[in-house]
Every structure is written in C-alpha cells, then in structure tokens.
Amino acid sequence: MKVAVFFNPDGVRDEIKQKLFDTLHSLDFKYYLADFNNADDTIEKCDIVLALGGDGTIMHAAKRAALHNKKILGINCGHLGYNAGLEANELNLLYMLKIGEYKVDYRMMLKITIGDKNYYCVNDAVVCKGALSRMIEINATFGGAKMHYRADGLIFSTPTGSTAYSLSAGGPAIEPTLDCISVTPICAHSLFSPPLVVRPDTEIVVEIDSDSRGDAYLTLDGETAIELDTKTPIKITKADVYAHIVRIKEDGFLKILKEKIK
C-alpha cells in the first residue's frame, strides 16, 4: 500500500512524526511526504492519505484527497480531532489498514461557484461581515424560494461541518453521512431567522444586498477568504465529489459527539 503522509510542519511534534514513520515502515507501507500547500502529485500516486494534525489539517487534506478520489485517515494531534479516525497514541492500530479491517464514510461536500471559478468545501462556506463592518444584508434563494437576512453572516454547512462553526451559532448537529445542507444565521437581527436544513439538490444563490453597508467576505472551510461585492452572485450546490473518510474504530456519531464536544 502506498501512503501519502500529510501534516502541517509546524503543528506536529517530531516524536509523533517519527513514531508514525517507524510504524509505517514496520508494516511495509511505502510512504511519501506530501507538501502541505502542493500535495496533488503525491496524493495522486498513493492509495490513501494519512493526515496528522488537528481538525483544520485533516479537513484540508480531506478536500485535496477527495478531488483525487482517494481515501483519508485523520490522526488527531490537536485539541478536538472530531473527524479523526485515530488518536496519536493509537498508531498501533494502523495494521488494520493492511488487513482491510476498516470502513469508509462518504461525506458530502459543497461546490461554490463565483463567476467562472469553482471552489470546494468539506465543512462550510460562510458569508460574513468584515471585522469592522455593521451587520450585512443578504438575499438568498433556495430553489426559487427567496429569503432576506440582516445578520453578521450565514453559514452554509455540510453534515460533516454541522458540528463545527454552525453548531456554535445554534445550528443542528447532523449525522455526517447524510446528504443535506444546513443554513445557520450568525447573530440575525430578526425574530424569524431559524436555522434551515434543505435537500442536497437545492440550488442556493446568495447575493449581498445593494443596501448592505460595509465589507462582506466568503470564507471556505475557515482557510480561504474572498471579498464579495453586490454585483456577483454566489452559487452553492452539492459537489459531485465526496470526501472518503476512513474509520478504523466502531465509534458511532452520537458517541463521538458526546466524547468530543462537551
């Protein structure tokens, strides 16, 4: 088995990395180090990606792996590690990859289209105000049904991302292997702005209202920020690719939710 090892160089202790390399060597896995910012060539030639780090690193790697139709196993070296399949002290369980004793969850992703550019998200796409701006005015269309929001922002989340920023803003925790899109307002200035869950085939179009004052941005999985204007609509749909998340342990959704988010 060929393995792409993916980690943030500044985020993982040397002794953990060395233990991983020793474990892979003992299992006769051929492994390659993937560049954090340019991993595509390495991922393409491997069978599976091992992402060593916290949730941000794991989700960043999951997105890259999904675009190459590759599986990913997250190994938690961070604080929460909600989407990790193993903890850093469980590297001895990697032998289960060799004998095929694991399952793969297929996680829905989002495709974001702005003009002629496409972007992909594993967790969420967030339309939000700038740091010093007042609340923004957002027009959103859900398969033809129109909604208007006055808020600090809107979170469009996959089920995988529902337990991240969306949950903190009052959105629902959704079983991560479902296909749907959750929509959670951030500090809405309205008595009727409930979180929504819509069908995965719903085409969502978002525009910043011309009456909106101040800057507005779109952030993708918390790592890419795009400044928005009032002229260019944002189209949000279910992506045509899935993140392939490897699970070695038999922990279910509710057990992980209870243990990780206290």
Please identify what each model-predicted range represents:
Residues 54-57, 78-80, 160-163:
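Short glycine-rich anion-binding loops that position phosphate/pyrophosphate groups of nucleotides
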Residues 106-110, 121-123, 134-138, 152-154, ...:
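A generic structural signal for short beta-strands and their flanking turns/coil linkers
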Residues 119, 127, 132, 143-146, ...:
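ATP/nucleoside-binding phosphotransfer catalytic cores, i.e., glycine-rich phosphate-binding loops
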Residues 8, 50, 76, 125, ...:
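A residue-level signal for conserved active-site and pocket-lining positions in enzyme catalytic cores
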Residues 69-71:
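Proline-centered loop/turn at the N-terminus of a beta-strand
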Residues 1-48, 52, 60, 64-67, ...:
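ATP/NTP phosphate-donor binding region
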Residues 80-152:
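Catalytic core of DAGKc-family lipid kinases
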Residues 148-152, 156-192:
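Gly/Ser/Thr-rich active-site loops/lids in small-molecule metabolic enzymes
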